[in-house]
Amino acid sequence: LFPYTTLFRSLIKENLRYTLVIRQPDFVGEDGVCAALERTKHRKQNPLLEEVRFGTVPGETCVQLLHVGAYDDEPVSFAKMDEFVHAHSLTRAEDCHREIYLNNATRTEKNRLKTILRYRVK
């Protein structure tokens, strides 16, 4: 099972905009996902099911870091990433970033959470 990913489009906590991404194995195609989604819609009504879509994420040049600790402490890790970007004459391509969660946040102590932080650079 692949870890789930969140693509954050806003960095302001009070106005979070994000997309949840669940990577699929290579043998799972769009037809299979759409068929499973239709079966799910018939069993259980949920308006959010209309927002589910299948897509691909293109490869990109990124900077990433393994953050260990509470989500609220991520700004320290982002500062380290920004220093690295500056030291290597790169620039951040956009304000959004990805977070890949390696632990279950409901079962892991906050100070032991592991999250890969990633953003695009140019």
Stretches found by the model and what they are:
Residues 2-7:
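Short, small-residue-biased leader/transition segments that mark boundaries at the very start
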Residues 8, 113-115:
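Aromatic/basic-lined ligand-recognition segments
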Residues 11-32:
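Extracellular-facing segments of soluble proteins and assemblies that are Gly/Ser/Thr-biased and enriched
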Residues 13-17, 60, 112:
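Short connector loops at helix/strand junctions that flank enzyme active sites
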Residues 22, 116-122:
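A short, hydrophobic, proline-anchored segment that marks a local hinge/packing element in signaling
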Residues 33-73:
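A mid-sequence, solvent-exposed acidic-amphipathic segment
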Residues 38-42, 71-93:
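Long, well-ordered alpha-helical scaffolding segments within enzyme catalytic domains
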Residues 95-113:
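Beta-rich nucleic-acid/ligand-interaction surfaces
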